[in-house]
Each structure stands twice: as structure tokens, then as C-alpha cells.
């Protein structure tokens, strides 16, 4: 019975191909927070009106929420990748906990329930993000390839 001969040395993987231009990457970096902010703003406005009629104040609330969310998300995406892995995870934890808590508070639930739910979401986010950054970055926060 024949067997495949071992290869010489260790097989190496080449770099991941980059099929998009730098301009496309820049547009994606800007479009992601804007689109996500619009979805978040619509969701917050829908939670706030509780199925009632759409009013001008509700639209204003949704757009202001969308702008603030998009700006904060853009800041987190810009700043967080420069931080050490522990602080990087804490930054995403705070962002996700606050964002979820704000959305949940618009539904009319009690503030204690909103805080408890947002702390639970933040705890799960911290566990997932810390694991991800701990296994994919070195101690200085640089990606391991």
C-alpha cells in the first residue's frame, strides 16, 4: 500500500487576498457605523412609541439617537483597536452594555430590570471579547497572524 510522501518543511499559508481597494475599505469603515446607527435609531424610536403613531418628536428622537450611536461606534472602532487587549474588551463591554441598556429602557420596563439586563449583556460581552482578544492578540494588543 502506498502512502503520500511527507512534504519538505512546514506548509505555509499566504496572506489573505485583499480584493477591495483602499477607497472601498474607507467607505466601508464609514458606512458601517452610519448604517448601524440608523438601524439602532429606528429601533429606539420604535421602542419609545410602543406601537403608537409616528410623530415628529419620535422621528427627531430616532435621528438624534442614530447620530449619537454612529459617532460613538465610530470612536470605539477607531480607538479600541489601539488599546491593550484587556482595555479593548472593557471598552466593547461598556459600549454594548450601555447601548443595550438604553434600548431596553425605551421599552418602558423598570430601571432595575434595565440595569440588570444590561449588566448581564455586558458580562457576556466581556467574556466573549476578552476570550477573542486574548486568543488573537499579543499582550501589547497587536494581532497575531
Question: Where do the PLM segments sit?
Answer:
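Alpha-helical transmembrane segments of multipass membrane proteins
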Residues: 41-46, 75, 98-106, 127
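Membrane-helix boundary connector in multi-pass membrane proteins
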Residues: 98-117, 134
Amino acid at each position: 500500500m502506498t502512502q503520500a510522501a511527507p512534504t519538505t518543511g512546514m506548509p505555509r499559508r499566504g496572506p489573505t487576498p485583499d480584493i477591495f481597494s483602499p477607497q472601498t475599505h474607507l467607505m466601508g469603515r464609514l458606512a458601517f457605523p452610519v448604517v448601524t446607527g440608523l438601524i439602532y435609531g429606528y429601533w429606539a424610536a420604535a421602542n419609545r412609541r410602543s406601537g403608537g403613531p409616528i410623530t415628529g418628536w419620535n422621528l427627531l428622537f430616532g435621528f438624534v439617537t442614530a447620530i449619537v450611536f454612529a459617532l460613538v461606534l465610530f470612536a470605539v472602532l477607531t480607538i479600541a483597536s489601539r488599546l491593550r487587549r484587556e482595555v479593548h474588551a472593557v471598552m466593547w463591554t461598556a459600549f454594548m452594555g450601555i447601548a443595550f441598556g438604553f434600548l431596553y429602557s425605551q421599552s418602558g420596563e423598570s430601571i432595575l430590570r434595565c440595569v440588570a439586563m444590561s449588566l448581564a449583556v455586558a458580562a457576556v460581552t466581556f467574556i466573549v471579547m476578552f476570550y477573542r482578544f486574548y486568543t488573537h492578540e499579543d499582550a501589547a494588543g497587536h494581532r497575531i497572524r
